[in-house]
């Protein structure tokens, strides 16, 4: 995105949730770095660290530390590391979610209490916990961004409790936007269309969902991590200085559609 060169010069922030070079979070990290931002990345566990380290090197990013959002001490440690390195930060990207994939099939009615609580803790509460710590080290006028999905608004196959969690996450965006607005800190979410990522591998019949979106979205295609990254760049930069509490859709317009397109072919379920 050459026209964005220099847009984030002098801005510093952390991206939490990069898993590999197909992650939506990675698309965001690249867009920010190309626009001049200084980036920090986190990881969870040694396996992910091995994947994230070469990506950090590619962008010249700071490795801010291991972060398991179920352990608040690790979130504290990450923000302490950021404060020690930079003093203040300007943006945070939260790209963290989890649910037992075995409970994403079948009926939502059968969701276990344990998985419901764990899904909400990791996918929803962690955003509030991260925002609370960001508030302490963020410059006035900063920006916080999280990732959601259309399953928060409408029932989607094989999404179950994650849809409930994303709905709660979107509500959290609005409440946090009010809490932080007096400092000029903006809080928003991107609702991306389906993209082949590590997280998406846990969703059943995902190839079918991709094709359905491709055939029925107004733009007649799915979206890329680069397109999500460019939208994130807008929301994290001063270009969106008047925008907060929003869910910004990057889904080729699929969220506007009420029924199958009349010219869309009939497709059977494509097994992953």
Curated annotation (Swiss-Prot):
Disulfide-linked positions: none
The protein's enzyme class: oxidoreductase
Gene Ontology terms describing biological process: fatty acid biosynthetic process
CDD domains reported for this sequence: ENR_SDR (cd05372)
Site (Involved in acyl-ACP binding): 207
Pathway(s) it belongs to: Lipid metabolism; fatty acid biosynthesis
Annotated source species: Rhizobium meliloti (strain 1021) (Ensifer meliloti)
Keywords for the protein's UniProt record, in alphabetical order: Cell inner membrane, Cell membrane, Fatty acid biosynthesis, Fatty acid metabolism, Lipid biosynthesis, Lipid metabolism, Membrane, NAD, Oxidoreductase
Compartment list: Cell inner membrane
Protein name (record): Enoyl-[acyl-carrier-protein] reductase [NADH] 1
UniProt-annotated binding residues for NAD(+): 17, 23-24, 44, 68-69, 96, 166, 195-199
GO cellular component: a single term: plasma membrane
A GO term for molecular function: enoyl-[acyl-carrier-protein] reductase (NADH) activity
Topology relative to the membrane: Peripheral membrane protein
NCBIfam families, per database record: PRK08159.1 (NF006019)
Family of the protein in this entry: Belongs to the short-chain dehydrogenases/reductases (SDR) family. FabI subfamily.
Superkingdom of this protein's organism: Bacteria
Pfam families: adh_short_C2
Location, primary (coarse class): membrane
InterPro entries documented for this protein: Enoyl-ACP_Rdtase_NADH (IPR014358), NAD(P)-bd_dom_sf (IPR036291), SDR_fam (IPR002347)
Keyword Oxidoreductase: yes
Record keyword Nuclease present: no
Residue positions of the active site: 149, 159
């Amino acid at each position: 995105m050459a026209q964005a060169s220099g847009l984030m010069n002098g801005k510093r922030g952390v991206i939490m949730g990069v898993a590999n070079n197909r992650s939506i979070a990675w698309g965001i990290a690249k867009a920010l770095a190309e626009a001049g931002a200084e980036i920090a990345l986190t990881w969870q566990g040694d396996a992910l660290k091995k994947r994230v380290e070469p990506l950090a090197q590619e962008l010249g990013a700071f490795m801010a530390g291991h972060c398991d959002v179920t352990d608040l001490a690790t979130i504290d440690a990450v923000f302490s590391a950021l404060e020690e390195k930079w003093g203040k930060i300007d943006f945070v990207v939260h790209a963290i979610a989890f649910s037992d994939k075995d409970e994403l099939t079948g009926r939502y009615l059968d969701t276990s209490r344990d998985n419901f609580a764990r899904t909400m803790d990791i996918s929803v509460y962690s955003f509030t916990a991260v925002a609370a710590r960001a508030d302490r080290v963020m410059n006035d006028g900063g920006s916080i961004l999280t990732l959601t999905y259309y399953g928060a608004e409408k029932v989607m196959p094989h999404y179950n409790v994650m849809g409930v969690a994303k709905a709660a996450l979107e509500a959290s965006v609005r409440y946090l936007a009010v809490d932080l607005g007096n400092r000029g800190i903006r809080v928003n979410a991107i609702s991306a269309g389906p993209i082949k990522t590590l997280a998406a591998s846990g969703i059943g019949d995902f190839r079918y969902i991709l094709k359905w979106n491709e055939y029925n979205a107004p733009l007649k295609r799915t979206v890329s991590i680069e397109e999500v990254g460019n939208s994130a760049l807008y929301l994290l930069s001063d270009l969106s200085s008047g925008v907060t509490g929003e869910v910004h859709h990057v889904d080729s317009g699929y969220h506007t559609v009420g029924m199958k397109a009349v010219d869309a072919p009939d497709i059977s379920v494509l097994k992953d």
